[in-house]
């Protein structure tokens, strides 16, 4: 099963994360299929960038987001957009 999850990058006390589509059995920082966004929590204002079209495509194809990624999608409004697309 494909999961949308965070992959840690950055240095020791300055974490940066990629939001990736990866096989659920792969290690956290292992192989991934596609990069769908970035998340930088350590900055003064949390910075997130998303590729909405890619995310919606992966979700429609059955990818499952992890809890943390789901919270990021909800705060950005992507999850609500996905739910309305499902109802149509």
From Swiss-Prot:
It comes from Leptospira borgpetersenii serovar Hardjo-bovis (strain JB197). GO terms for biological process: translation. HAMAP family: Ribosomal_bS16 (MF_00385). The keyword Ion transport does not apply. GO terms for molecular function: structural constituent of ribosome. One of its GO terms (cellular component) is cytoplasm. Keywords: Ribonucleoprotein, Ribosomal protein. InterPro entries: Ribosomal_bS16 (IPR000307), Ribosomal_bS16_dom_sf (IPR023803). It holds the Pfam family Ribosomal_S16. Belongs to the bacterial ribosomal protein bS16 family. The gene is rpsP. This is Small ribosomal subunit protein bS16.
